[in-house]
Amino acid sequence: MGVFRFKRFNVVNERSAMKVNTDGVLLGASMTIRPSDRHLLDVGTGTGTIALMAAQRLSDLICRPQPIEGDVSRPEGVSITAIDIDEASATEATENFRNSPWADMLSAQNITLDAYSATLAPEKRFDHIFSNPPYFDDSLQAPEQRRNDSRHTSTGL
């Protein structure tokens, strides 16, 4: 599939179980992000597209948008954590984050939501939690199990 180009970042879209798609891009574009949001969680990140869109939006809200490509302000004190149950997806998201202007505020982990929740301190809070969750119940299964895991509700998060 190659590279999907956004306004100020690119998403490599080769190994993730769930590729960049219209649903995810629309979700990222329509999310209400507040300038006060500092700790965000993306559940089921896939390629990391929605987390990257949130990082770009926060950068625009908190800092003055830069007109020169590649010269992007980075808001301080912001952390966006992205988790995915698929190892290849979490790895690809990590690479996409590393190659973005906001690498210092983005991180990805290969972990389930239940396992991740168990690692959090009781006082840990997120200002914003978002997800483009699996939404098929009994639809036609794909030949690749990883794709089914990212598309069907039976596998959980």
Regions found by a protein language model. Name each.
Residues P133-L157:
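Mobile active-site "lid"/loop adjacent to the S-adenosyl-L-methionine
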Residues S79-D84:
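Conserved SAM-binding motif I beta-strand of class I
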Residues M1-P35:
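Class I SAM-dependent transferase core
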Residues A93-T94:
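Conserved SAM-binding loop
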Residues D37-G44:
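Conserved class I S-adenosyl-L-methionine
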Residues G48, L52:
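Glycine-rich SAM-binding Motif I of class I
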Residues W102-A115:
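Conserved SAM-binding strand-loop segment of SAM-dependent methyltransferases
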Residues T119-H128:
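A short acidic, Gly/Pro-enriched loop at the edge of an enzyme's catalytic core
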